[in-house]
Amino acid sequence: MNISLLLVGPTDDPLLNQLIEGYVKRLNHYIKFDLQPLPALKNTKNLSPEQQSQKEGEMILRALDPSDRVILLDEKGKQMSSLGFSEFIQKQLNAGGKKLVFIVGGPYGFSPEVRKRAMSSISLSAMTFSHQMVRLFVVEQCYRAFTILKGEPYHHQ
């Protein structure tokens, strides 16, 4: 199985990009992991939040394969500990399939169609984070999950 992080829009901060790439490199020691950036929508000033979410949703759905196991990163999703997340990852790996796709949406969340396509959604925290920061947190938590699964000393309880 491969894991992808599907992103709406670029990661603007070069320091965040450097950190994200560092964790992606580490993750590839355990599993094929890649970032799948989608272009940011242009000319959104005349779009309502719902219209913007809809257009982003269409772009997201076009980027997915029918066999992809889709997990949304969403403030309304299920919260879990790092240990719980590692167990979640293990269950996904055990379920098989070619690719597990985590999706970080745009500023107005996910369209109803994207929500229907997803198997589940995860919330990283009750706090609100920028979409830029969420990218780093997800990649780090994926790395942490694999070190937990392999019994390596990165995670401390």
Residue map of PLM features:
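N-terminal beta1-alpha1 ligand-phosphate binding loop
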Residues: 1-27
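Loop/turn-to-beta-strand initiation segments
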Residues: 2, 97-102
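Conserved RecA-like P-loop NTPase ATPase core
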Residues: 5, 71, 105, 138
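General small-molecule cofactor/ligand-binding pocket signal
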Residues: 6, 34-36
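Short glycine-rich anion-binding loops that position phosphate/pyrophosphate groups of nucleotides
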Residues: 11, 75-78, 106-108
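Short glycine-/acidic-enriched loop or helix-start segments at secondary-structure transitions
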Residues: 15-17, 81-83, 111-114, 133
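S-adenosyl-L-methionine/SAH cofactor-binding core of RNA-modifying enzymes
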Residues: 32, 39-98
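Structured adenosyl-cofactor binding patch, chiefly the S-adenosyl-L-methionine
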Residues: 112-156
